Regions:
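Charged interaction scaffolds used for protein-protein
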Residues: 1-14, 19-56, 60-147
Length: 147
């Protein structure tokens, strides 16, 4: 997932949890007292402390001594955002498609794409993933401003 923080000046800081190194991920586990699987779940649930930890890990690339206990993100409730990345959307849709084909069901694909539209970092990634799977008829044509 990508965690983004919008600064007061409007600039957006993005950190991909998937791009963290093993040591960075371990540091996040340590400060949160959670396993990586638990952290991923917390991110899916939009837990602000987990999102703060991902931004903290990204910032530690420039400031290795940055202390998590005092690391704050003003107005985090309004300025933090989390969403699936394209590769995650591809993985989810592929798994749902395979399951749907095995069971001759279309409903699960519809539900999955609705969930992904609400959870994707970039909504256009859902349409692109559907197109790539040959399910372009499920793609919504949205203006780029809705991304």
């Amino acid at each position: 997932v990508i965690v983004a923080y919008r600064h007061e000046d409007g600039t957006v800081e993005e950190v991909s949890a998937g791009d963290l190194s093993a040591l960075e991920a371990a540091a996040v586990e340590d400060v949160l007292g959670s396993t990586w699987q638990e952290i991923e779940q917390r991110l899916r649930e939009k837990d602000p402390t987990a999102m703060r930890a991902i931004i903290w890990a990204g910032r530690r690339r420039e400031d290795a001594d940055l202390d998590f206990a005092t690391f704050d993100l003003p107005q985090a409730g309004r300025r933090l955002r989390v969403g699936y990345e394209r590769y995650e959307i591809d993985d989810i849709l592929t798994a749902v498609l395979e399951s749907s084909l095995a069971k001759s069901e279309d409903a699960s694909m519809e539900l999955a794409q609705q969930h992904l539209r609400n959870s994707a970092y970039r909504r256009s990634d859902v349409d692109a993933a559907l197109e790539a799977l040959g399910k372009g008829h499920l793609a919504r044509r949205r203006p780029a401003s809705e991304d």
